[in-house]
């Protein structure tokens, strides 16, 4: 029996990393940056970015993420944040309102501190979730 295709989306308020070609340790992600977000190298610019937070529920950003997803297959979300800062929850709510077909494909969500994780660790977390989820079926 073939396993369904799983797309992993690691989502923060600033970017989404999408793995749609598998979750093996050497898979590469596609990065979707939030509109208006730029990486600053000057210390003052970096301070400005930290002090002035952007909207969590940015529809233009979420539409870009949805546009970067494959048309079929299951979706596993990985994110962090609590309450109003939870981009993963805001993304699902946006998808439910605008693209219920995409929202229906979300099969799971993992709450991890993405700021301290490498891409390999994110994929390892997805593999662990998949192995546990497969055992539950």
Residue map of PLM features:
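Terminal alpha-helical anchor/extension segments at protein ends
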Residues: 1-137
């Amino acid at each position: 029996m073939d396993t369904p295709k799983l797309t992993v989306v690691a989502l923060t308020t600033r970017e989404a990393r999408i793995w749609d070609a598998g979750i093996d340790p050497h898979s590469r992600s596609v990065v979707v940056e939030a509109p208006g977000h730029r990486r600053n190298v000057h210390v003052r610019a970096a301070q400005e970015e930290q002090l002035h937070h952007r909207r969590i529920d940015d529809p233009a950003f979420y539409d870009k993420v949805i546009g970067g997803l494959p048309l079929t297959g299951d979706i596993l979300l990985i994110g962090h944040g609590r309450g109003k800062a939870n981009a993963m929850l805001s993304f699902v709510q946006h998808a439910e309102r605008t693209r219920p077909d995409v929202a229906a494909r979300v099969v799971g969500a993992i709450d991890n501190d993405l700021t301290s994780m490498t891409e390999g660790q994110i994929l390892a977390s997805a593999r662990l979730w998949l192995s546990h989820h497969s055992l539950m079926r």
